[in-house]
Design a protein with these regions (language model features):
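Bacterial N-terminal signal peptides
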Residues: 1-6
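A residue-level marker of the well-folded mature domains of exported/periplasmic proteins
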Residues: 7-189
Length: 189
C-alpha cells in the first residue's frame, strides 16, 4: 500500500521540494487506526515525504473540515480512511478540481469520481474467516445444535460490511439450512 503511494506519477520527491501527503483516519479510539496512521506516516516520511496525519474522532464534519484544510494547504496526495464513505463529496470534489490524487484506504469512498486508487483488504475473505471462526467455536461439524445466532452487517455507510456479510453467510448458510444455526429474527439478507 505505502509502496504504491511512493511511485504515484506527479508525486515524485525532490530533495529540495518535499511533497505533502494528507492522511485522514476516522478515529484514535481503535488501535487499528492508530497503527495504520502512524505506520503510514513513518513509512512515507522515511521515503522523503512530509505527512499531515489527522484523526477525525468519528465525526464526519470534522473529517470534511480536515480534508478541506488539506486541499487548501496544498497537499499533493490525499489518503482517506472515511467514517462514512458517502459523505465526503464536497472535499473530494475540491481535491479533484485541484488535481490532487485521492487514495481511498480500506473503506471505499462512494458517490464520487475523485478516487484515484482504492487500497483495501479482501473483505469477502475477512467475512469468510469470521464465519469459519463461528463454525470452529461452536464445533458445528460435530455438534447437533441448534444454536441461536443473530447477524449484524454493520454501518450502511461502510461499503465493506456487505462483503463481510456475504463471506460469512457463504460459510454459515449451510448450517442455517441444516438447522444447526437458527436465526430467530429470520433476517439473513
Amino acid at each position: 500500500m505505502v509502496a504504491g503511494m511512493v511511485v504515484i506519477p506527479g508525486a515524485a520527491v525532490k530533495a529540495d521540494d518535499k511533497k505533502l501527503i494528507g492522511v485522514t483516519m476516522p478515529t484514535k479510539d481503535l488501535q487499528r487506526w492508530n497503527q495504520d496512521g502512524e505506520n503510514m506516516k513513518k513509512e512515507l516520511e522515511a521515503a522523503g515525504y512530509e505527512v499531515d496525519l489527522q484523526y477525525a474522532s468519528n465525526d464526519v464534519s470534522t473529517q470534511v473540515s480536515q480534508l478541506e484544510n488539506q486541499v487548501a494547504n496544498g497537499c499533493d496526495l490525499l489518503v482517506v480512511a472515511s467514517i462514512d464513505g458517502s459523505s465526503l463529496g464536497e472535499p473530494l470534489k475540491q481535491a479533484k478540481e485541484a488535481g490532487i490524487p485521492v487514495i481511498s484506504y480500506d473503506r471505499l469512498l462512494m458517490n464520487s469520481d475523485a478516487v484515484t486508487y482504492y487500497a483495501t483488504f479482501d473483505n469477502y475473505k475477512v467475512g469468510q474467516k469470521q464465519g469459519e471462526y463461528l463454525v470452529d467455536a461452536l464445533d458445528l461439524d460435530n455438534q447437533d445444535g441448534p444454536f441461536n445466532i443473530e447477524l449484524f452487517t454493520g454501518d450502511p455507510g461502510d461499503n465493506n460490511c456487505n462483503f463481510f456479510f456475504g463471506g460469512a453467510m457463504d460459510v454459515l448458510q449451510k448450517y442455517i439450512d441444516e438447522g444447526k444455526l437458527v436465526v430467530k429474527s429470520g433476517q439473513t439478507e
